[in-house]
Swiss-Prot record:
The lineage of its organism: Eukaryota, Fungi, Dikarya, Ascomycota, Saccharomycotina. It is found in: Secreted, Cell wall; Membrane. Residues 343-762 are annotated as: 15 X 12 AA repeats, Ser/Thr-rich. This is Flocculation protein FLO11. SMART domains: Flo11 (SM01213). In the reference strain S288C, the transcriptional activator FLO8 contains an internal in-frame stop codon, leading to impaired FLO11 expression in this strain. Keywords: Cell adhesion, Cell wall, Disulfide bond, Glycoprotein, GPI-anchor, Lipoprotein, Membrane, Repeat, Secreted, Signal.
Length: 1367
């Protein structure tokens, strides 16, 4: 029984809905007819529509669309109002109709005697209403009005009787509409604009429609390349919003303290952005339907990308990644930022709990918990980070490095291992398994591209990085502790009794070699790193590829690193931990507990206070032990004016210079390019540092065991001998340490190791160019070396370095000797350090000693002397460890901004090119030679050549030429004296200007020589031949490029309007003219002067070939006797001219206005370029024969440059009468064409657009006159050279299409080339023809409504008849 009741219910519901008039599915789309469009937009308000009517001598008319209503589908009823400039009586009109209508009626007759139609009473002020099919969409919301023509016929038929009083120009004409036909001057070939309105007159179109966003690529945090990632929790989901990089962001979370968690899933969400509308251009004359919209609508949907990662060690072979958490992290530059409040693995940058902008090519890391950085880092909680980390505060990372932060174990792009041997090219490990972009292992062996080991020696021969720690600590370099750790590469090694990793190598409780590079971290405060360096900071133990600082001594072995942290903080070259942290790398910055800006290309770290680092150096600061490869300061501001690095903590630390300075508990100025470090706790410096807790630095560090570092890195050891064969460093502590020189100074009241020289408990003078260290007293370092002092002031007047301790240590050679309780060899390096024994270092080597184990970047030894006689370094340690060869490498990339082409205007792109044009004025040098013959004939003519350049323009160059000949007389005279010949040449020098262009400067040089001649009157000399120059001559030809610049704006109603401005840009082409094989062949008997041109060619920064030319005059040496057979040969040299022009391109930028709509602005740029034109010389000039006086008429031209930079020339006729014998023949008149540059002025109109108080867009026009030059060729007339006829005038305007969306190119007019450009207010409108659609659409939809109701009622009646059967 339920089925019949259900059927009855459905039938009754259908009947009820029909009776109430609810629309059914049978009602067509156009049922709601008559909707009016509120917004009717003039599509091209800036075009000149009077120009075409003026050209046709038609009185001006205007057209406006007063109303539009939607009928159905794509049919609209429009009303137009046409008004003439003047009133014309109706008696003159014969016919008026609208033709070419794309609508139900192709022709709308308004007035006509033949058609017996009289719908209007004024042909100059009338309205007309008709229907059109709008088939061409402007975008997804708007549609164009189809074009049509209004045909006027005056004075036809019976109206012709009034022709005598007609005064309005043309009598029969068509006036057309459209925005799609105009030239580059803004002159429309149509007479009225086109209009557009919202599709279906939907006045809400665009307001509620959301647009789909095209997202970039999703990447997990373990991938290479710059990516932004953020993670708020461990193994949680990271979100990134408003990231500008083309790659999506995903964050990878590592496991926390439990290594058993199977997998962690990290996701990336893209927050919905405000709905934006993308307007598209369509040029499809589709059938009357607007359904086909190829536009992309952006939706505010959120995309989610998840990545599952096991919490077991994961190798991360690739390079950099960026993560941010709990806040948007913009990564505008090519770098990466990562952060995580939990273990986060990221190959590049991480930031946590705060927005982390990474605008520059540097790297920043910060963490409120142990964070390891760019190479490898470890912390009291195992944290490794490939580059930079930041936490608990915004950390900008402007550079192309990487930033990571985590309050839990985080592994990074390098490798870390802990509690177990780990091998990896960049391996990190933690007591909790942490995976990073490279490899990390924890509590189990992990193999990665780098290698780290703990509790056992681990050699790392390659340029990777290895870190190990008794607490999981990994660092990009290598550190070892409690066991020897070799570091063959130029990385850095650090070790600490507490987990500390450094960007180079760190190991703890076991030797760990780290051959790789450095990193920067910052924590507990925003750490901006605008420069291409790296910054790291952490409020907890943070390790960083370069610098580290800790509440225990922190060595910073490299030459440019800064660290600061209220707790152990490690930086790109220095690491810090609750135990000593070495910082082996050469340029890193860390900041903690305070924002740390790093504007320069170095790295800056600060702690507990902002630390700006404006210079290209690095700054580090820490209220606890701070190590910095260059400069560190703590608890006080530390200015670093030099080009070094500066570190500061608990106070702002500016680092303007490229030096490095470190200070602690007191301000430390570092004016010179040197480096200074001081700390109230043990601080190690840029080369090698050691602390009361074993800390090894920049290249190799070992703790409780010897660590050899044979390469140019730095090695530090603590509690055990650690040799460091690499370069030198100076440290001071417990007092301000100024380091004015380009060296580095570090001091520490606790064990301090320094790559150069360290001394403790006593002053240490360093007379040589090495480095000296002292402790517990201020240490000035005036020279270019490095000084460290401890417990006493240590002056370092010389550029050397000396360390001494309790016992003497001789270092005779320029290398270094270090002895330790066990032998340790370092084959490639030179440095000497000794501990517990005084060590003099007379040579340019370095010596360090400390009452506590001190390791230095070069070589350190403890408890036993170590001689180093040769230029290498010998290190002995409690266990032998050799490192054959190694070097440290750091790279950072600078960001390059490329403006992609808009999807809306794919042809537009931005070109930036610097072109240099060299203009050379070739002034012929006329040398008159006096000959001892009775009569002399001087022939002056002009050589002109014409050619066509690559732009198709005809150009020519002319220059006067004088040839002096000797006419024989009845007597022959022999010259018996010597003649003096003057040779004028030009000396040119070439250089490169600041733009990278090759320029040259030339200056004339005159040499006078004496030419001997024969004394015999009857001497006959052989002919002297002079070859012509083969150097190309470059000439500058200027022209004008016409372009149209347009800008787009959006009205409050959401309408997009575009303004166009036509501009004429003068430009110059560079043309090179190649000379012919020979210029003039002169017979003997007369001194002959030959003028040629010497040119030099170079390539400017734009890759264009430019040249500079200068005239050179050479006088030949000939015998003294004269003869009658002299003749001259005219030049046939090709002349090449450089003609520069400008290529016009349009750059577009897209933004979102307050209404959430996407608008696009366009900027037109002109890029100069050069074309080369070769001109062929004219026919030979007529030679002069003897015996008759000869009159030669020629033309002299002079060239100059006008204000627009164009080359113009002025020519004048010149007549020369020779003095010759009576039998000389008369030369014919000149037939050489003369080319003249005629300046003219191009007049253009520039328009500017603004918005008035009513929100309307208004346009102002300004007329400008731009001078330009035309080339005219003159051919001599038949009556001699004086009568010139103008036979040709070459003009060369260039038509340029501004975008690739130009539709059809209109034919050129007599005034200017016509260019079809996009419609002035947006997308292109294709020209509509006069075709009339043959199908019709019902104009009344109520018929369909009634039919639907009848059909429904019929169905209901049928069902009623069926009901008894059912029941």
């Amino acid at each position: 029984m339920q089925r019949p009741f259900l059927l009855a219910y459905l039938v009754l519901s259908l009947l009820f809905n029909s009776a109430l008039g609810f629309p059914t599915a049978l009602v067509p789309r156009g049922s709601s007819e008559g909707t009016s469009c509120n917004s009717i937009v003039n599509g091209c308000p800036n075009l000149d529509f009077n120009w075409h009517m003026d050209q046709q001598n038609i009185m001006q008319y205007t057209l406006d669309v007063t109303s539009v209503s939607w009928v159905q589908d794509n049919t609209y009823q429009i009303t137009i109002h046409v008004k003439g400039k003047e009133n014309i009586d109706l008696k003159y009109l014969w016919s008026l109709k609208i033709i070419g209508v794309t609508g139900p009626k192709g022709t709308v007759q308004l007035y006509g005697y033949n058609e017996n139609t009289y719908l209007i009473d004024n042909p100059t002020d009338f309205t007309a209403t008709f229907e059109v099919y709008a088939t061409q969409d402007v975008n997804s919301c708007q549609v164009w009005m189809p074009n049509f023509q209004i045909q006027f016929e005056y004075l036809q038929g019976s109206a012709a009787q009034y022709a005598s009083s007609w005064q309005w120009g043309t009598t029969s004409f068509d006036l057309s509409t459209g925005c799609n036909n105009y030239d580059n001057q803004g002159h429309s070939q149509t007479d009225f604009p086109g209009f557009y309105w919202n599709i279906d007159c939907d006045n809400n179109c665009g307001g509620t429609k959301s647009s789909t966003t095209t997202s970039s690529t999703s990447e997990s945090s373990t991938t290479t390349s710059s990516t932004s990632e953020s993670s708020t929790t461990t193994s949680s989901t990271s979100e990134s919003s408003t990231t500008t990089s083309s790659t999506s962001e995903s964050s990878t979370s590592s496991s926390t303290t439990a290594p058993a968690t199977p997998t962690t899933t990290s996701c990336t969400k893209e927050k919905p952005t405000p709905p934006t509308t993308t307007s598209c251009t369509k040029e499809k004359p589709t059938p009357p339907h607007h359904d086909t919209t190829p536009c992309t609508k952006k939706k505010t949907t959120t995309s989610k990308t998840c990545t599952k990662k096991t919490t077991t060690p994961v190798p991360t072979p690739s390079s950099s990644t960026t993560e941010s958490s709990s806040a948007p992290v913009p990564t505008p530059s090519s770098s990466t930022t990562e952060s995580s409040s939990a273990p986060v693995t990221s190959s590049t940058t991480e930031s946590s709990s705060a927005p982390v902008p990474t605008p520059s090519s540097s790297t920043t890391e910060s963490s409120s918990a142990p964070v390891t950085s760019s190479t490898t880092e470890s912390s009291s909680a195992p944290v490794t980070s490939s580059t930079t980390e930041s936490s608990s505060a915004p950390v900008p990372t402007p550079s192309s490095s990487t930033t990571e932060s985590s309050s839990a174990p985080v592994t990074s792009s390098t490798t870390e291992s802990s509690s177990a041997p780990v091998t990896s090219s960049t391996t990190e490990s933690s007591s909790a398994p942490v995976t990073s972009s490279t490899t990390e292992s924890s509590s189990a062996p992990v193999t990665s591209s780098t290698t780290e080991s703990s509790s056992a020696p681990v050699p790392t021969p390659s340029s990777s990085t290895t870190e190990s720690s008794s607490a999981p600590v990994t660092s990009s370099t290598t550190e070892s502790s409690s066991a020897p750790v070799p570091t063959p590469s130029s990385s850095t090694t650090e070790s600490s009794s507490a987990p500390v990793t450094s960007s180079t190598t760190e190991s703890s409780s076991a030797p760990v070699p780290t051959p790789s590079s450095s990193t920067t971290e910052s924590s507990s405060a925003p750490a901006p790193t605008p420069s291409s360096s790296t910054t790291e900071s952490s409020s907890a133990p943070v390790t960083s590829s370069t610098t580290e600082s800790s509440s225990a001594p922190v060595p910073t072995p490299s030459s440019s690193t800064t660290e600061s942290s209220s707790t152990p903080v490690t930086s790109s070259t220095t690491e810090s931990s609750s135990a000593p942290v070495p910082t082996p790398s050469s340029s890193t910055t860390e900041s903690s507990s305070a924002p740390v800006p790093t504007p320069s290309s170095s790295t800056t770290e600060s702690s507990s206070a902002p630390a700006p680092t404006p210079s290209s150096s690095t700054t580090e600061s820490s209220s606890a032990p701070v190590t910095s490869s260059t400069t560190e300061s703590s608890s006080a501001p530390v200015p670093t004016p030099s080009s070094s690095t500066t570190e500061s903590s608990s106070a702002p630390v500016p680092t303007p210079s490229s030096s490095t300075t470190e200070s602690s508990s007191a301000p430390v100025p570092t004016p010179s390019s040197s480096t200074t470090e001081s700390s109230s706790a043990p601080v190690t410096s840029s080369t090698t540092e050691s602390s009361s807790a074993p800390v090894t630095s920049s290249t190799t560090e070992s703790s409780s065991a010897p660590v050899p570092t044979p390469s140019s890195s730095t090695t530090e050891s603590s509690s055990a001998p650690v040799p460091t064969p690499s370069s030198s460093t100076t440290e001071s502590s417990s007092a301000p340490v100024p380091t004015p020189s380009s060296s580095t100074t570090e001091s520490s009241s606790a064990p301090v190791t320094s790559s150069t020289t360290e001394s403790s408990s006593a002053p240490v003078p360093t007379p040589s160019s090495s480095t000296t260290e002292s402790s517990s007293a201020p240490v000035p370092t005036p020279s270019s070396s490095t000084t460290e002092s401890s417990s006493a002031p240590v002056p370092t007047p010389s550029s050397s370095t000396t360390e001494s301790s309790v016992a003497p240590v001789p270092t005779p050679s320029s290398s270094s000797n270090i002895t330790s309780s066990a032998p340790s060899s370092t084959p490639f390096s030179s440095s000497t350090e000794s501990s517990s024994v005084p060590v003099p270092t007379p040579s340019s080597s370095t010596t360090e000693s400390s009452s506590a184990p001190v390791s230095s970047s070069t070589t350190e030894s403890s408890v036993a002397p170590v001689p180093t006689p040769s230029s290498s370094s010998n290190i002995t340690s409690s266990a032998p460890s050799s490192i054959p060869f190694s070097s440290t490498t750091e790279s950072f990339s600078t960001g390059t901004t490329v403006t992609p082409s808009s999807s809306k205007y794919p042809g537009s792109q931005t070109e930036t090119s610097v072109s240099s044009t060299t203009e050379t004025t070739i002034v012929p040098t006329k040398t008159t030679t006096s000959v001892t013959t009775p009569s002399t004939t001087t022939i002056t003519t002009t050589v002109c050549s014409t050619g066509t350049n690559s732009a198709g323009e005809t150009t020519s160059g002319c220059s006067p030429k004088t040839v002096t000949t000797t006419v024989p007389t009845t007597t022959t005279t022999s010259v018996t004296t010597s003649s003096t010949t003057t040779i004028t040449t030009t000396v040119c020098s070439t250089g490169t200007n600041s733009a990278g262009e090759t320029t040259s400067g030339c200056s004339p040089k005159t040499i006078t020589t004496t030419v001997p001649c024969s004394t015999s009157p009857s001497e006959t000399a052989s002919e002297s031949t002079t070859t012509s120059p083969t150097t190309p001559v470059t000439t500058v030809v200027s022209t004008t490029v016409v372009t149209t610049e347009y800008s787009t704006s959006t009205k409050p109603g959401g309408e997009i309007t575009t303004t166009f401005v036509t501009k004429n840009i003068p430009t110059t082409y560079l043309t090179t003219i190649a000379p012919t094989p020979s210029v003039t062949t002169v017979t003997n008997f007369t001194p002959t002067t030959i003028t040629t041109t010497v040119c030099s060619t170079g390539t400017n920064s734009a890759g264009e070939t430019t040249s500079g030319c200068s005239p050179k005059t050479v006088t030949t040496t000939v015998p003294c006797s004269t003869g009658t057979g002299e003749y001259t040969t005219e030049a046939t040299t090709l002349v090449t001219t450089a003609v520069t022009t400008t290529v016009v391109t349009t750059e577009s930028s897209t933004g979102t206005n307050s209404a959430g709509k996407t608008t696009t602005g366009y900027t037109t740029k002109s890029v100069p370029t050069t074309y080369v034109t070769t001109l062929a010389p004219s026919a030979p000039v007529t030679p002069a024969t003897n015996a008759v006086p000869t009159t030669i008429t020629t033309t002299e031209c002079s060239a100059a440059t006008n204000a627009a930079g164009e080359t113009t020339s002025v020519c004048s006729a010149k007549t020369i009468v020779s003095s010759a014998s009576a039998g000389e023949n008369t030369a014919p008149s000149a037939t050489t064409p003369v080319t003249t540059a005629i300046p003219t002025t191009v007049i253009t109109t520039e328009s500017s657009v603004g918005t008035n108080s009513a929100g309307e867009t208004t346009t102002g026009y300004t007329t400008k006159s731009i001078p330009t030059t035309y080339i005219t060729t003159l051919i001599p007339g038949s009556n001699g050279a004086k009568n010139y006829e103008t036979v040709a005038t070459a003009t060369n305007p260039i038509s340029i299409k501004t975008t690739s969306q130009l539709a059809t190119t209109a034919s050129a007019s007599s005034v200017a080339p016509v260019v079809t450009s996009p419609s002035l207010t947006g997308p292109l409108q294709s020209a509509s023809g006069s075709a009339v659609a043959t199908y019709s659409v019902p104009s009344i939809s109520s018929t369909y409504q009634g039919a639907a109701n009848i059909k429904v009622l019929g169905n209901f009646m049928w069902l009623l008849l069926a009901l008894p059967v059912v029941f």
